[in-house]
C-alpha cells in the first residue's frame, strides 16, 4: 500500500521497495537529479516523486535526465504531462494523478439566480463514489475521500453528529431519520455535496464541499467564480491528532484544487471560538481574512490560495 516507501538513509534517500539507495545528485536552484535505478514496478515513478518531495521539502524540482529515462514508459508519460524532463514540485502536485476518476466539467454556460441576484458559472454534476486517493508517507496511511451514502453511512453519521464535541459547533444533533434526511438534502443540493474522509478505507471525517458563490458565505466577501468552500468534522476520536488532521485537511484542499483547475481559492468560515481548528488551519495553508456575523454565529473567514498552497505548503 505504501508504494516505493522512500526513507532517509545516512546522507541520502533509500527505496525500500527496490531495496537500494536512490542515486540522487544535486542540480541547480535546489533541484536534484534522479538517475534511472533500473527496471521499475508499475506506478513506481510518480509515487516515488511524491514521497521524495515529502522527504526532502527543500527540493524545488527533480530532474529525470532524458538520456537515462527515455526508454522508461512511466517517465515518458510524465514528460508528456509536464512537457519537460524537469519535474517541478509545485507543477507535479497539480497533476490529476490522485483523482480517482476524471473530474466532471461544467458546460461553460453562465446562470443567473434571480432570488439571490448572482450570476455564476453553471456547475458540473456531482461526482459519484470515490473521488481522491493518495498514500500519505508522513502518517503511513492511505487517505481517500468518497461521496457519503445515506444508507451505509447513516448510523455512523448519526453517532458523529450526536457527539457533544461535534454538536457544539454543528448544532445538527438528532435521530437516525433526521441525519438521513440531512444527508439526502446535501446529495440533492445544486451547489454542495458531502464527502466521507477515510484512512486506510476506514471512515474518519465528514466534509461538506460547496461552491462559495451560491452559499451563504458568498454574501460576506468578494468571491471569485470558482471559489470552493468546506465544512469539516472529525467523527472518530482516535483520528483527532494534529498529524491526522493535517493529512486530511491538506488532502481535501488538494482534491478541490485538482478537481477544478480554475479554482484559485478555498475558504472556511468556522466559529470564532473553535480554537482547536484554528491551530490546524495555518500549517495547512489557510490565512485569516476577517471576522463577521452569520445570524447564528460569529465566524472567522480563512482562505487558502492555489499558488501559496503548492509553492509554500505542499502535502
From Swiss-Prot:
One GO cellular component term: cytoplasm
Reactions listed under catalytic activity: N(6)-hydroxy-L-lysine + acetyl-CoA = N(6)-acetyl-N(6)-hydroxy-L-lysine + CoA
GO molecular function, one term: N-acyltransferase activity
EC number: 2.3.1.102
Keyword line: Cell membrane, Cytoplasm, Membrane, Plasmid, Transferase
Temperature section of the record: Optimum temperature is 40 degrees Celsius.
Keyword Membrane part of the UniProt annotation: yes
Single Gene Ontology BP annotation: siderophore biosynthetic process
Subcellular location: Cytoplasm; Cell membrane
A Pfam family annotated for this UniProt entry: Acetyltransf_8
Gene3D superfamilies: 3.40.630.30
SMART domains given in the database record: AlcB
pH dependence: Optimum pH is 7.
SUPFAM superfamilies reported for this sequence: Acyl-CoA N-acyltransferases (Nat)
Primary localization class, coarse: cytoplasm
Coiled-coil ranges per UniProt: none
Pathway annotation from the record: Siderophore biosynthesis; aerobactin biosynthesis
UniProt signal peptide: none
Function (record text): Catalyzes the transfer of acetyl from acetyl-CoA to the N-hydroxylysine. Involved in the biosynthesis of the siderophore aerobactin which is a chelator that mediates the high-affinity iron transport systems induced under iron-stressed conditions.
Family, per entry: Belongs to the IucB family.
Entry protein name: N(6)-hydroxylysine O-acetyltransferase
Amino acid at each position: 500500500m505504501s508504494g516505493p516507501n522512500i526513507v532517509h538513509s545516512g546522507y541520502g534517500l533509500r527505496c525500500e521497495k527496490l531495496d537500494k539507495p536512490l542515486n540522487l545528485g544535486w542540480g541547480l536552484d535546489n533541484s536534484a537529479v534522479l538517475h534511472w535505478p533500473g527496471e521499475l514496478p508499475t506506478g513506481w515513478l510518480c509515487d516515488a516523486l511524491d514521497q521524495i518531495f515529502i522527504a526532502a521539502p527543500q527540493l524545488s524540482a527533480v530532474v529525470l535526465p532524458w538520456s537515462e529515462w527515455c526508454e522508461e514508459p512511466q517517465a515518458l508519460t510524465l514528460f508528456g504531462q509536464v512537457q519537460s524532463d524537469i519535474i517541478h514540485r509545485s507543477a507535479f502536485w497539480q497533476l490529476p494523478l490522485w483523482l480517482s476518476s476524471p473530474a466532471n466539467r461544467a458546460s461553460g454556460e453562465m446562470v443567473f439566480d434571480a432570488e439571490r441576484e448572482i450570476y455564476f458559472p453553471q456547475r458540473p454534476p456531482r461526482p459519484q463514489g470515490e473521488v481522491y486517493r493518495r498514500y500519505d508517507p508522513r502518517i503511513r496511511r492511505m487517505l481517500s475521500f468518497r461521496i457519503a451514502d445515506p444508507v451505509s453511512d447513516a448510523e455512523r453519521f448519526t453517532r458523529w453528529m450526536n457527539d457533544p464535541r461535534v454538536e457544539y459547533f454543528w448544532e445538527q444533533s438528532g435521530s437516525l431519520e433526521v441525519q438521513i434526511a440531512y444527508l439526502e438534502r446535501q446529495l440533492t443540493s445544486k451547489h454542495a455535496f458531502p464527502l466521507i474522509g477515510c484512512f486506510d478505507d476506514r471512515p474518519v471525517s465528514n466534509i461538506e464541499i460547496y461552491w462559495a458563490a451560491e452559499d451563504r458565505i458568498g454574501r460576506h466577501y468578494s468571491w471569485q467564480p470558482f471559489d470552493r468552500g468546506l465544512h469539516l468534522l472529525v467523527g472518530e476520536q482516535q483520528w483527532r491528532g494534529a498529524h491526522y488532521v493535517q493529512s486530511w485537511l491538506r488532502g481535501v484542499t488538494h482534491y478541490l484544487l485538482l478537481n477544478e483547475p480554475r479554482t484559485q481559492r478555498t475558504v472556511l468560515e468556522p466559529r470564532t471560538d473553535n480554537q482547536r481548528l484554528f491551530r490546524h488551519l495555518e500549517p495547512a495553508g489557510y490565512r485569516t481574512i476577517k471576522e463577521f456575523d452569520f445570524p447564528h454565529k460569529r465566524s472567522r473567514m480563512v482562505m487558502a490560495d492555489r499558488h501559496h498552497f503548492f509553492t509554500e505548503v505542499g502535502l
